[in-house]
């Protein structure tokens, strides 16, 4: 559990605070063959998971080994021939090209920050993998571009904080570092984490009295909107160019780099060509190839790989759940009976459909096709009876699995759809309270969209206690990055074709919350989105047959 292994074998350099793991040693019973269980696939997996180069197994008399670089297994060998510390140090240097005694390698041996001193094994492995690439890029005279693929909820911001701290301690931050994200909520979360490490030397980039409030800080935290990276073409990067010279940063970390890095905010990378560029993503590289995978997903993945290279370290949702760091996911597949049929244009009119974008009743002139199927519902057409049926079934499921007063996100197709879903769920909740002789709590279900007075202010109480703000009905405001540890359920009333979006949305429920005993979350799928799961994931749990509400 939790990624533990029998032993980690480390290289130690005198007068440095931290050791460098280079191998895993599996201890076996004396009576067992030391090569038992040392399949090639397992060797590769152990090396990847711990970012080590070798795997050894021994029964105390003989040993076997797996070498990541050659892909070969060896043994059994007599135990007296087992490599000692100088042997492993020399072998690591020869295979990686990194001499651990040089100043360039110092970052590998720096301790984590006092704010986050006990990294989880995969967080430490991710930082080591990033540093190894940075060291080798610098040796070649290349700019270091590093990609880390970490499951949502695995602590990407803590990884960033400790990575920057270790660079700082190794005197590798000659100029400030920039942490760049695309939403205010992510900026505030990053600021909280980075301030815990760097204190007042971590500042949010904003205008104050006509000046950059972060100008004297070591760590600058910004959204690309603040830097002016979403300006019109003639004013691209207005704040960036006004307040920052070229090559102003020594390190740039781009959070959720799969979302927008290839739009205008790539300007910040171009203006800092000599900085270390680090991309953080929660999107798994291996997505199921299917007709549902969108052209946009293909382009995003290709762009990430082209710019950053392959991820130097990957920590998947499955691995995090197996390790016990993220909540398990219980899938409930539902499908409204209305979705099994195809509607003629006459039936659409008879059902009282409304325009999903404007809310006005559909007329015959609006219907350009002879037939309409489920994916058209709620994105283009909204059938009031369908919304009512789905909300009724969801409320019944919530009552059955923990009660209605639990924290839930419902992903809807459009804003009007979110409005109608919130209204239906509120009505159902009021009726439930009346039947139970209970006083309804405030803001049970609410629309949560971007913009002022449009529900975004309810994110704080949604995160908070169980006294109000239970069900957030949104389109995509909460799809990524916002930490809601109390979240008990993620609901899809929305049709999706993008695995990237699906994984982001799913990740909202994956955090464990020990205070309420939350170690799993529910995924209610009303639109077949779980078909976007990677094949390795959908083997656990078994796929239930869909029920018809």
Residue ranges and their predicted role:
Residues 1-176, 181, 185-200, 215-219, ...:
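ATP-dependent helicase/translocase motor core
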Residues 53, 225-226, 251, 444-546:
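Conserved RecA-like P-loop NTPase helicase motor core
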Residues 112-116, 375-379, 389, 529-549:
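Long, largely alpha-helical accessory region at the distal end of helicase-like NTP-driven motors
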Residues 184-208, 424-433:
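Conserved helix-turn-beta segment of the N-terminal RecA-like "Helicase ATP-binding" lobe
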Residues 190, 230-234, 257-267, 290, ...:
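Conserved ATPase-coupling elements of RecA-like P-loop NTPase cores
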Residues 218, 369-474:
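Conserved C-terminal RecA-like helicase domain
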Residues 240-279, 283:
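SF2 helicase catalytic motif II
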Residues 291-406:
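Interdomain helical connector at the RecA1-RecA2 junction of SF1/SF2 helicase-like NTPases
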């Amino acid at each position: 559990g939790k990624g533990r292994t029998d032993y980690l074998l480390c290289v130690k350099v005198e007068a440095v605070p931290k050791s460098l793991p280079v191998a895993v040693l599996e201890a076996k019973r004396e009576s067992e063959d030391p090569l038992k269980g040392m399949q090639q696939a397992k060797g590769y997996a152990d090396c990847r998971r711990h970012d080590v180069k070798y795997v050894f197994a021994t029964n105390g008399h003989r040993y076997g080994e797996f070498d990541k670089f050659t892909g070969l297994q060896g043994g059994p060998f007599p135990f007296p021939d087992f490599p000692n510390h100088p042997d492993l140090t020399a072998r690591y240097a020869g295979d990686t090209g990194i001499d651990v005694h040089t100043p360039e390698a110092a970052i590998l041996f720096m301790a984590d920050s006092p704010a986050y001193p006990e990294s989880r094994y995969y967080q430490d492995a991710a930082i080591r993998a990033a540093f190894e690439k940075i060291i080798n890029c610098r040796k070649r005279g290349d700019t270091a571009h590093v990609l880390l693929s970490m499951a949502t909820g695995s602590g990407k911001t803590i990884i960033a904080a400790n990575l920057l701290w270790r660079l700082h301690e190794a005197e590798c931050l000659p100029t400030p570092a920039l942490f760049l994200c695309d939403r205010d909520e992510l900026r505030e979360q990053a600021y909280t984490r980075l301030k815990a490490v760097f204190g007042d030397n971590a500042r949010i980039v904003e205008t104050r009295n006509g000046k950059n409030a972060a100008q004297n800080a070591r760590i600058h935290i910004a959204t690309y909107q603040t830097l002016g990276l979403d300006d019109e073409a003639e004013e691209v990067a207005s704040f960036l160019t006004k307040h920052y010279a070229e090559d102003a940063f020594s390190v740039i970390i781009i959070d959720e780099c799969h979302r927008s890095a290839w739009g205008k905010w790539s300007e910040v990378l171009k203006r800092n060509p000599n900085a270390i560029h680090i991309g953080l993503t929660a999107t798994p590289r291996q997505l199921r190839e299917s007709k549902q995978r969108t052209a946009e997903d293909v382009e995003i993945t290709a762009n990430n790989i082209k710019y950053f290279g392959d991820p130097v370290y990957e920590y998947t949702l499955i691995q995090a759940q197996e390790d016990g760091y993220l909540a398990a996911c219980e899938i409930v597949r539902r499908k409204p009976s209305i979705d099994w049929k195809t509607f003629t244009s006459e039936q659409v009119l008879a059902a009282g459909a409304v325009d999903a974008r404007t809310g006005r009743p559909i007329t015959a002139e609006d219907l350009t096709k002879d037939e309409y199927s489920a994916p058209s519902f709620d994105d283009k057409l909204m059938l009031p009876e369908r919304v009512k049926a789905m909300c009724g079934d969801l409320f019944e499921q919530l009552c059955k699995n923990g009660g209605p007063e639990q924290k839930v996100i419902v992903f809807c197709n459009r804003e009007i759809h979110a409005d109608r879903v919130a209204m239906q769920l509120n009505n159902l909740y009021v009726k439930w309270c009346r039947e139970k002789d209970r006083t309804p709590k405030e803001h049970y279900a609410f629309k949560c969209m971007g913009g002022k007075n449009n529900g975004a202010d309810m994110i704080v109480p949604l995160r908070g206690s169980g006294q109000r703000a239970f069900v957030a009905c949104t389109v995509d405001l909460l799809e990524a990055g916002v930490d809601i540890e109390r979240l008990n359920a993620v609901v899809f009333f929305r049709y999706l074709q993008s695995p990237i979006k699906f994984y982001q949305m799913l990740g909202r429920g994956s955090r464990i919350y020990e205070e309420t005993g939350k170690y799993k979350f529910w995924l209610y799928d009303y639109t077949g989105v779980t078909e976007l799961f990677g094949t390795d994931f959908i083997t656990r749990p078994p796929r239930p047959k869909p029920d018809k509400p």
